[in-house]
């Protein structure tokens, strides 16, 4: 598989570990390393990578700001790295648009597993055939992976799309959070509901869905 990866990491040893693992797993891959936020944004614009590994603590702008700016124009999968194992940092990264989050130091096999999961989510939809689904004024086309709200296209990341797709496929049903985590993220994420909470908030924001009076996504506590 040919893949273009951008690694934004100011610690050379960490960047080399990531690059080595990627090249070993995907021999034809092109890996670009940036050591500052400014360089990361420039390389992103020039290289148009398929995947971004982004360190939180870099020379300015930091990883959070780089993630925010990338999300203004792109839905590319983003994995963020940090030395801080805090829920607040994790939630902030996900709310800014990151798809996943990994704490340093990390096992390179776990890193590769997460990158594979990101590429898998980005590369294909859940098995729904080519059907078109409509919920109120929301339309999801499973064949083209297009989502429209009142006729206007809604730009979603691959993970946001897969979550919405699963919800639409079971419209009217209450789905356990463990089921959604396994279906959208994978079995290794079942014990971490923070992913689901943040991505539901992201979907609601993009759909203009009021959490107090939801039209599309309702939360049943305890499910």
For each of these PLM feature ranges, what is it?
Residues 52, 56-59, 84:
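The short loop immediately C-terminal to the conserved phospho-acceptor aspartate in CheY-like receiver
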Residues 35, 58-61, 88:
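Hydrophobic residue at a beta-alpha junction
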Residues 11-32:
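Two-component/phosphorelay signaling modules centered on CheY-like receiver
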Residues 4, 117-174, 178:
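Short, Lys/Arg-enriched segments at the junction into DNA-binding effector domains
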């Amino acid at each position: 598989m040919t893949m273009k990866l951008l690694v934004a990491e100011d610690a050379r040893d960490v960047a080399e570990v990531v690059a080595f693992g990627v090249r070993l797993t995907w021999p034809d891959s092109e890996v670009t390393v940036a050591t500052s936020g400014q360089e990361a944004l420039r390389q992103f614009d020039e290289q148009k990578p398929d995947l971004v590994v982004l360190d939180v603590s870099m020379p300015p702008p930091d990883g959070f700001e780089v993630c925010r700016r990338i999300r203004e124009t792109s839905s590319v999968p983003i994995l963020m790295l940090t030395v801080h194992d805090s829920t607040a940092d994790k939630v902030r990264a996900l709310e800014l648009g990151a798809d996943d989050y990994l704490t340093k130091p990390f096992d390179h096999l776990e890193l590769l597993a997460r990158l594979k999961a990101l590429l898998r989510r980005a590369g294909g939809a859940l098995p729904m055939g080519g059907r078109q689904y409509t919920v109120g004024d929301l339309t999801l086309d499973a064949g083209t992976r297009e989502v429209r709200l009142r006729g206007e296209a809604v730009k979603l990341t691959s993970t946001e799309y897969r979550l919405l797709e699963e919800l639409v496929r079971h419209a009217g049903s209450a789905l356990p959070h463990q089921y959604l985590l396994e279906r959208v993220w994978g079995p290794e994420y079942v014990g971490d509901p923070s992913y689901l909470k943040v991505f539901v908030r992201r979907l609601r924001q993009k759909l203009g869905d009021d959490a107090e009076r939801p039209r599309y996504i309702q939360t049943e506590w305890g499910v």
